Amino acid sequence: MRYLHTMVRVGDLEQALDFYCRKLGLIEQRRFDSEPGRFTLVYLAAPGDVDAPTADAPQLELTWNWDPEHYSGGRNFGHVAFAVADIYALCQKLLDQGVTINRPPRDGRMAFVRSPDGISIELLQDGAALEPREPWLSMPNTGSW
């Protein structure tokens, strides 16, 4: 058995791609449109997984159903997690692009944000935690994460 991907349904594909690719930095690997099924699948990978030694690197599958649907309960899914090279730099980049940092990286190790569809995204500092510092140290939580 091997892990393949995590699928999340999105309400607006372009908005989701803006968040996951432009803001978070994931890279689109492949896309599949199904006319009969009326859906689009987009597979994304973290930059560190793009050149993985096998084609079995984990991916995030975005599923967009062409006919409008309302999805609720993003919180009951749990979260998707990514290891990041510099949690402070990424959180600042996200903040500068209008993304709410729901759980700031006060400890230099962990932060949470949400996708446009309400999916909780955990960001973990790769390796040892960074030294706690401002503005993150005194930044309060916003909403749920």
Range-by-range predicted roles:
Residues Y3-H5, R75-V80:
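Eukaryotic phosphotyrosine signaling hubs
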Residues M7-A57:
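Core segments of cupin and vicinal oxygen chelate
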Residues R31, F82, Y88-W145:
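Vicinal oxygen chelate
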Residues E35-P36, H70-S72:
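Short glycine/serine/proline-enriched coil/turn segments at secondary-structure junctions
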Residues P47-D51, D67-E69, I87:
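Short, charged/polar surface micro-motifs in flexible loops or helix N-caps
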